[in-house]
């Protein structure tokens, strides 16, 4: 089916044909026949790289040309940025007089973001979309198309319930809405399509042939052929990587832990470094410098060394800047190999000639080492083969013995993906969504709420949710977040409305409110008490306790005994409860290190985590501390000012004395400290300074000095020279002392 034949605006057809896409892939053509361009709901359950995004673009842009508006829902912020960048390419498309306006929404969860109403395409995470619904964003009722990318993640215990409820709500508020769901190949696609009232396009077709096999005995056994790996040595991964690179391909290597991915990258880098050409070394040296420009920890320096040899590792413990450098370097074929954890398979567009799945088992805290689902394997395998660049793609598992070889062939290569199931039917999943439905007047009684929940995928699969709903509503009543009249109508209290808008778990809010009531009886509220309070909530993923942690954490808890705003369990009582308490103390200790300006290196070393983990954890803590300040203000507790200051300090990793400087754009924790130590302890002192004096401070430079003065409202005549801005450098490097 030719692009030129489609019922699309001519400008869009010209755009695609001019981009080298003259005709559709078979699954895309089937989607057209099923009514994609006629406003019909559609579920496309097709492999990676078979053109799902193009389906979304055509549906959205045709609707926009007719006066509509679209939202593109993704599971990850990184994927949102990738799609946003792609859709910006349509901004000058003359299908509307003023072009196509694109927006992105991944930030604060307590805003309506009404400015997005001016956009034609909005890219958002499912959590952000849910929060926009809770905060009453008026433009949502004007949507004509909703695209749900990676919709099979309804199966995820963490993200699934939010995506499921969000889709159900959007369908209810706009009956003419077209829903386009994009999914990996799943076992029960028909059931998911039926729930959505959608036509189903299901296919195994790929533009690049995918060969799936198992490496054992110096050969890869595929379904229909066997291939010997030349010069295979004792290290299977190195052998498979070398074999791919000799043919001009790139490799992704999936490992089950961050440490394993780093170890693999280092081994492959040592091997590859001897084979690099001078021109390649020059490109890689530049990329290495890009990594070092943002380096503050051993992990970053380790990454830089690997990158200098054409290899990288990629996991959630890396800083966002480093992940982007790695991804871009791989897309540009400067980096040849990435060793990564399975998070890379969750949507990011980074295909490679060969995908090596080194580990097919992962550790589960309840069951030990367990095999990964077939669906997860298929997601990783689907990254093999770059369309129009590779003649084929290969996904290779590694067997350690003959029995394992047979198991891998049967359980993965020749297996079908599992059915996905809704995870909405638990009280933790239901709490926030029930409160949201009541707080937004979406549901005004128990009957309303049950009727709405009957429209979810959970109800479609498993039936009645009444018992769970009743338990959750009773909890919300007990915690004074909703009230129920004698006539049965439900209404949110001021606390309930606030909690819903803040987008935090009602149980977290209940624990925070309880702690703040205790604060009313204290002469003052300790910072550590507030840090521990938020780190003890279900919204914060507490740090794991290691064997060597117990003595210092118990000692530290004793030193802060008078600070705690939550009950301190008896160490001789419930072991689980006491361990949870200690985990909260450990996590709060990390937050305290962060706001006391300890270096990332000190924190990552002491707590054995990655720099990306610090950022992710502090982002959550910032939001919860902001929520704590809002709840404190509502309850009239004495913690409001302290909590507001702490939220700013956690966000920036700064001491209290830097509050006046830290909120200046471009001034991070390290630069603020340098300014303060140079005598510029306030904005007034900074404003009175001479620009050259500010620029001379290490890490500032002319460009930032001019920017700072402009932000302070000072007239600037100084023109900075055209020099590269100095990178931020690491500050303190001493390990955290628990002696006060």
Curated annotation (Swiss-Prot):
tRNA-binding keyword on record: no
Catalytic activity: Couples ATP hydrolysis with the unwinding of duplex DNA by translocating in the 3'-5' direction; ATP + H2O = ADP + phosphate + H(+)
All residue ranges annotated as the Helicase ATP-binding domain in the record: 33-204
Biased composition (Polar residues): 726-740
Keyword Signal: no
Motif residue range(s): DEAH box: 149-152
Matches recorded under InterPro entries: DEAD/DEAH_box_helicase_dom, Hel308-like_dom4, Hel308_SKI2-like, Helicase_ATP-bd, Helicase_C-like, Helicase_Hel308, HTH_61, P-loop_NTPase
Top-level taxon of origin: Archaea
Domain Helicase C-terminal positions: 236-436
EC number, UniProt record: 5.6.2.4
SMART domains, per the entry: DEXDc, HELICc
Region of interest (Disordered), residue spans: 716-740
Pfam families found in the cross-reference section: DEAD (PF00270), Helicase_C (PF00271), Helicase_dom4_arc (PF21280), HHH_5 (PF14520), HTH_61 (PF20470)
Gene Ontology molecular functions: 3'-5' DNA helicase activity; ATP binding; ATP hydrolysis activity; DNA binding
Annotated binding of ATP, by residue: 28, 46-53
Enzyme kind, highest EC tier: isomerase
BP terms from Gene Ontology: DNA repair
Function field: DNA-dependent ATPase and 3'-5' DNA helicase that may be involved in repair of stalled replication forks.
Subunit structure: Monomer.
Family: Belongs to the helicase family. Hel308 subfamily.
Entry protein name: ATP-dependent DNA helicase Hel308
């Amino acid at each position: 089916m030719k692009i030129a034949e489609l019922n699309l605006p001519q400008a869009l057809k010209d755009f695609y044909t001019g981009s080298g896409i003259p005709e559709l892939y078979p699954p895309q053509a089937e989607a057209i026949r099923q009514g994609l361009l006629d406003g019909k709901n559609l579920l496309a359950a097709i492999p990676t790289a078979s053109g799902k995004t193009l389906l979304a673009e055509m549906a959205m842009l045709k609707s926009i040309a007719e006066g509509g508006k679209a939202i593109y829902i993704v599971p990850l912020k990184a994927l949102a940025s990738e799609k946003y960048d792609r859709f910006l390419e349509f901004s000058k498309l003359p299908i509307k007089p003023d072009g196509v306006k694109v927006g992105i929404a991944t930030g604060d969860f307590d805003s309506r973001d009404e400015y997005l109403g001016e956009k034609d395409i909005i890219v958002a995470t499912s959590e952000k979309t849910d929060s926009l619904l809770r905060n009453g964003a008026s433009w949502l009722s004007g949507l004509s198309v909703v695209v749900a990318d990676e919709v099979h993640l309804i199966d995820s215990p963490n993200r699934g319930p939010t995506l499921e409820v969000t889709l159900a709500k959007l369908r209810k508020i706009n009956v003419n809405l077209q829903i386009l769901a994009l999914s990996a190949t799943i076992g029960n696609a028909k059931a998911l399509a039926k729930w959505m009232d959608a036509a189903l396009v299901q296919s195994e077709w790929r533009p690049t042939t995918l060969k799936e096999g198992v490496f054992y005995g110096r050969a890869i056994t595929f379904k229909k052929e066997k291939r010997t790996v030349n010069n295979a040595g004792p290290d299977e991964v190195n052998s498979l990587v070398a074999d791919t690179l000799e043919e001009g391909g790139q490799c992704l290597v999936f490992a089950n832990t961050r440490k394993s991915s780093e170890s693999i990258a280092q081994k492959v880098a040592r091997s590859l470094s001897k084979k690099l050409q001078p021109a390649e070394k020059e490109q890689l040296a530049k990329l290495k410098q890009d990594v070092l420009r943002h380096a503050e920890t051993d992990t970053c320096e380790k990454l830089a060394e690997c990158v200098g040899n054409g290899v990288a590792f990629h996991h959630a413990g890396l800083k966002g800047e480093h992940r982007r450098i790695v991804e871009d370097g791989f897309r540009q074929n400067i980096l040849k190999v990435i060793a990564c954890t399975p998070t890379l398979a969750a949507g990011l567009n980074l295909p490679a000639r060969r995908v090596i799945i080194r580990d097919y088992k992962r550790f589960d805290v309840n069951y030990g080492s367990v095999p990964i689902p077939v669906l997860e394997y298929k997601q990783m395998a689907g990254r093999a083969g770059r369309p129009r660049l590779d003649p084929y793609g290969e996904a290779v598992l590694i067997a350690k013995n003959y029995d394992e070889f047979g198991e891998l062939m049967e359980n993965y290569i020749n297996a079908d993906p599992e059915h996905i199931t809704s995870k909405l039917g638990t009280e933790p999943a239901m709490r926030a969504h029930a409160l949201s439905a009541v707080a937004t007047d979406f549901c005004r009684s128990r009957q309303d709420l049950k009727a709405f929940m009957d429209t979810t995928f959970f109800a479609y699969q498993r039936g009645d949710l009444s018992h769970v709903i009743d338990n959750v509503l009773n909890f919300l009543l007990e915690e004074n977040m909703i009230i129920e009249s004698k006539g049965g109508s439900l209404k949110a209290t001021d606390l309930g409305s606030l909690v819903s808008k803040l987008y935090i778990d009602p149980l977290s809010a209940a624990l925070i409110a309880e702690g703040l009531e205790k604060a009313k009886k204290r002469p003052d509220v300790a910072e550590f008490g507030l840090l521990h309070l938020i780190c003890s909530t279900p919204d914060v993923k507490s740090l794991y306790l290691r064997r060597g942690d117990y003595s210092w954490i118990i000692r530290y808890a004793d030193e802060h005994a008078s600070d705690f705003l939550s009950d301190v369990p008896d160490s001789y009582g419930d072991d689980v409860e006491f361990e949870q308490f200690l985990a909260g103390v450990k996590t709060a200790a990390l937050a305290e290190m962060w706001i006391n300006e300890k270096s990332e290196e000190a924190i990552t070393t002491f707590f054995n985590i990655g720099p990306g983990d610090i950022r992710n954890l502090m982002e959550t803590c910032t939001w919860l501390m902001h929520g704590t300040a809002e709840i404190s203000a509502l309850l009239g507790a004495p913690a409001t000012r302290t909590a507001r200051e702490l939220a700013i300090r956690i966000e920036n990793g700064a001491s209290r004395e830097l509050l006046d400087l830290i909120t200046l754009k471009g001034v991070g924790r390290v630069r603020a400290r340098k300014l303060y130590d140079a005598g510029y302890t306030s904005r007034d002192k900074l404003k009175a300074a001479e620009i050259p004096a500010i620029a001379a401070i290490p890490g500032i430079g002319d460009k930032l000095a001019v920017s700072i003065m402009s932000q302070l409202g000072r007239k600037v005549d100084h023109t900075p020279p055209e020099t590269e801005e100095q990178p931020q450098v690491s500050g303190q490097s001493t390990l955290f002392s628990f002696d006060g």
